[in-house]
Amino acid sequence: MKKTFTGVVVSDKADKTVSVKVERRFMHPLYGKVVTRSKKYAAHDEQNEYRIGDRVEIIAVRPISKTKTWKVTRLIERPRGIETTAVETEGGNA
């Protein structure tokens, strides 16, 4: 069974790669407080189809590059009302 995580895409700038932030919550062993920790994983995105804010599932695969050993398997949720176009992302020459 391969490891799978669920996280949010925080960067899609690189070609065929997205950065996925995975958060985990646990009870502190001494103080009993619920603590949140996060880690970013570089995940393979062959078609460049995932955007910032998408909730995705990633799975461990063989090493694709030096830092990339995860692959996006499916889109879980896409935020509503966030559609970017090429004109908006380039910025104008105001």
Swiss-Prot record:
Summary of the function given for this chain in its UniProt record: One of the primary rRNA binding proteins, it binds specifically to the 5'-end of 16S ribosomal RNA.
Q: Which family does it belong to?
A: Belongs to the universal ribosomal protein uS17 family.
Tell me what this protein is called.
Small ribosomal subunit protein uS17
| A Gene Ontology biological process term | translation
Concerning InterPro entries, the annotation shows:
NA-bd_OB-fold (IPR012340), Ribosomal_uS17 (IPR000266), Ribosomal_uS17_bact/chlr (IPR019984)
What superkingdom heads the lineage?
Bacteria
Mind telling me which GO cellular component terms the entry cites? cytosolic small ribosomal subunit
Q: Which organism encodes this protein?
A: Deinococcus geothermalis (strain DSM 11300 / CIP 105573 / AG-3a)
Supply the Pfam families for this chain.
Ribosomal_S17
Among PANTHER family, the record links this protein to: 40S RIBOSOMAL PROTEIN S11 FAMILY MEMBER, SMALL RIBOSOMAL SUBUNIT PROTEIN US17M
Its keywords, alphabetically, are: Ribonucleoprotein, Ribosomal protein, RNA-binding, rRNA-binding
GO MF entry, a single one: rRNA binding
**Keyword Acetylation listed:** no
User: Does the record carry Oxidoreductase as a key word?
Assistant: no
* SUPFAM superfamilies registered for this protein in UniProt: Nucleic acid-binding proteins
**Subunit note:** Part of the 30S ribosomal subunit.
